[in-house]
From Swiss-Prot:
It comes from Halalkalibacterium halodurans (strain ATCC BAA-125 / DSM 18197 / FERM 7344 / JCM 9153 / C-125). Residues 31-53 are annotated as: Disordered. GO terms for cellular component: cytoplasm. InterPro entries: Cell_div_SepF (IPR023052), Cell_div_SepF/SepF-rel (IPR007561), SepF-like_sf (IPR038594). Homodimer. Interacts with FtsZ. Keywords: Cell cycle, Cell division, Cytoplasm, Septation. This is Cell division protein SepF. One of its GO terms (biological process) is FtsZ-dependent cytokinesis.
Length: 151
């Protein structure tokens, strides 16, 4: 005796009883079909007007902005951070600031860049590039310089 028949006996289900119930259900079921409605000309016009809300992705894409800044004190670091928060890449020239304040600015901007998911790279002596997460930078300056001298 199989497991299936044990369950049927336990629940007192017979094949005949289950077939009878299925037949009764299938006879009572009547499918109602609606005919498609015809659209009026005004309905089509309204659909066309609402369909104009679709905008191509190329027109939405904004041009990337790069801001060049040359801070003279540590207090200007917040202005640089605000530019990064506004999703603009920033090149910072720290040549006109003391070495101690320049370190503080770089530390502050490193934290800002980390918080927004961006990146900071050294471009040259006291020159840094800070980018938000929407800007990808490929390559490094030292690689490019070495490749240029080898040619």
């Amino acid at each position: 005796m199989g497991m299936k028949s044990k369950f049927k006996r336990f629940f007192e289900l017979d094949d005949d009883a289950s077939m009878y119930e299925e037949d009764a259900v299938s006879r009572d079921f009547v499918e109602e079909v609606e005919e498609p409605r015809r659209r009026s000309r005004t309905g089509v016009k309204q659909e066309r007007e609402t369909g104009q809300n679709v905008v191509s992705l190329q027109s939405v894409q904004k041009t990337a902005k790069v801001v060049l800044l040359e801070p003279r004190t540590y207090d200007e670091a917040q202005e640089i951070a605000d530019q990064l928060k506004n999703r603009k890449a920033v090149i910072i020239n720290l040549q006109r600031i003391s070495h101690e304040q320049a370190k503080r600015v770089v530390d502050f901007l490193s934290g800002t860049v980390y918080a927004i998911g961006g990146d900071i790279q050294k471009l040259g002596m006291n020159i840094f590039l800070c980018t938000p997460d929407n800007v990808d930078v490929t390559g490094t300056i030292t690689d490019m310089i070495q490749d240029g001298y080898r040619s």
